[in-house]
Amino acid sequence: MSFSFNFDVQLTTKCQQDEENQPQDGNEYSEVEPVPGITITTQDETVKAAVEHFPPATPHSLLNDAVSETITIGTLPPLNFLNESVFELTAYERDDEEMILSQTTAQCSDLISGVYEGGLKVWECTYDLLELLERDGERFAEKIVLDLGCGAGLLGILALKRGASQVHFQDYNSTVIEHVTLPNTLLNCLEEEEEEEEEEESKGKKPGKRQNNDEVIIEEEEEESMKSTEKTKSELKNKQKNEEVEDGRPHAKRQALDSSQHPKLSGCRFFSGDWTSFLSLILKEDPSLKYDIIFTSETIYNKAYYSALHNTLHRLLAPGGVIYLATKTHYFGVGGGLHLFEQFVEEKGVFDMEKLWVVEHGLQRHVVAMHFKTKDRF
Ligand SMILES: C[S@@+](CC[C@H](N)C(=O)[O-])C[C@H]1O[C@@H](n2cnc3c(N)ncnc32)[C@H](O)[C@@H]1O
């Protein structure tokens, strides 16, 4: 199986440097070091209200100064995403109302249960699932897909690139959606749009190059407002933020994405919040909504969330649909894992689970398909 990164910034993060000298200061969190390189901090479960996030009307603006890398797995289309090391080093520059960037850095933790659920980085089972999809050749054309607990969103992005008609991304943290999932989706959509434009131009179908229309608009808008109000960049940013309405829905201007210019992107929706409130938000809008494919990678590490997760899968999977679950056998320190989840699913009696792949190197990992038991399918 070919598996390559075409860009890799070799950086040592502060946490890596400090790892050996990490002080155990006995604060309110309990820390464990379950797997080399992964630190999990547990805290009482809290609930986070669901919010929908919208791409800005000028999508290129989210990619200013973005440093990206590309993963290529076999015959799958290349997937672009923000370089994690650069993201970590520049995290202090970002708006982060949830304060998860500072907390994860301060605690050198990849997971703070109920606060930050790990979506800032790509977890290894995502790569397993991508490999399996390459091997088995799942078809996405015209499908409605949910990337549940998406983090970087690579699984949903693959579905989008492979022709899914709608892809919904959900992550617990709004910071993850705003600063990672959305930019990653844009990186892929905008690149494809530009390639398509170039192809059309080379065939002589289009006279002029649209070439980053958005960037031109941004420049003009910014120049204009800088001239007239002499506001600094950060003042402008704050102004935009203050214009957001109270429930967190972005300013109307940000919602007005031109779907004719960005057809792929207009098939995407982005949500933050815990699974229970995500479920009520999305069903309130459309009680009949069902997904043909649900991806969920590295989301069964905490037994306390099984009920909300199972309920969400049960309510949202289409009859005849499939859930792809990618997981480690066991999550040391948090206690969850495949066997506990299997027991839970069996007790509920709603889904069959079919093991598609066991990855033996390193910590044992699995890719599992879940379908409704026959009686529930139709
Ligand atoms: C370890 S991360 C995995 C991220 C990504 N799927 C990957 O494989 O790289 C777990 C993800 O599950 C989601 N998650 C965990 N518990 C959740 C909960 N109670 N409600 C909503 N989302 C949750 C978070 O969004 C988080 O990004």
Feature locations, PLM:
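S-adenosylmethionine-dependent methyltransferases
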Residues: 1-378
